[in-house]
Amino acid sequence: LRATSIGACFALSAFDTPARALLLSPILNMESLILTMMDRAGVTEELLREQGEIAASFGQVLSWKYLCWVREHPVRSWTCPIHILYGSGDQMTPCRTVEAYARKHGAKLTVMEGGEHWFHTPAQLAALREWEERST
């Protein structure tokens, strides 16, 4: 299985253990990410529950149903080899979250210094290709 960002989150929530997993910039704690966005938008859980959906000033729509779904579908524990590529400048998932996940699940974590959540520069794409070759 190869998944990126929120795709990794959904894969970890939905799929049984694959033979191997390559996760690029994975969202490993969607609830925490949503709560951070709510805090940034000044939205409480009570307000979100009452209104159902709230458009935040930074372009995201916060959804009570989605927050509840995330809480009801936590990330599963896989027992396969897991390889993670993470950029040190990732703004979506804190480094401590990725490191804790890697320790708990025995994942091989590779951190690209200066990498971002979205690997898109020539240097980032080269690091991505190299990581894929080493991990498969």
Where are these regions (language model features)?
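Short glycine-enriched nucleophile-adjacent loop
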Residues: 8-21
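Conserved alpha/beta-hydrolase "nucleophile elbow" surrounding the catalytic nucleophile
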Residues: 2-8, 87
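Short, catalytically relevant binding-site loops at active-site mouths
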Residues: 6-9, 28-30
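The alpha/beta-hydrolase serine catalytic core
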Residues: 18-100, 104-111, 116-135
